[in-house]
Amino acid sequence: MKKTLPLEHAYRLINHGPVTLLTTHYRGRRNVCTIAWAMPVDAAVVAVVVSAGNYSFRAVRETGEFVLNIPGRGLLGAVLGCGSVSGEACDKFRRFGLTPIKARKVKAPRIAECIGHLECRVIPGHGKLAREHDLFLARVEAAAVERGLFGAQWKIDEPRARTLHHLGGTAFGVLSGRRPR
């Protein structure tokens, strides 16, 4: 079960650099894609880089909204799969066993199996980043996290709270449960 997180703590869901699953709802179709480049730039503002050639890029550009879903380590297969096929060609929710659930503030769905969610609306006027990607700045409209996994920050001693981190190619790491002394 998810609990609502105050927006002033929304940045703490992705401040440590986890891989995210970005969901959209565009022209009557839901979609999900893997995003490694998402970061907070303020308590309730995020920056997300999406390849300009992706179906998800068009969906975000046209609808102005998305959800950043934070997967736990148990979703590595879905993370890899959603990053390897186009949502234009298939229903990735069905193909990779993900459950769409209604978001509170945007039309894009949340992913039930994910441990955290940031519902976002694009701030108009984003600029090109290099030639192949676009940077979207978005305001977080709602934030939620799985009960028991987050206090003032992620409870990394809890194995289910350990997030995935992209190391390059198909290599991923998992957030450790050890805290520095």
Positions of the model-derived regions?
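Basic, polyanion-binding surface patches
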Residues: M1-R181
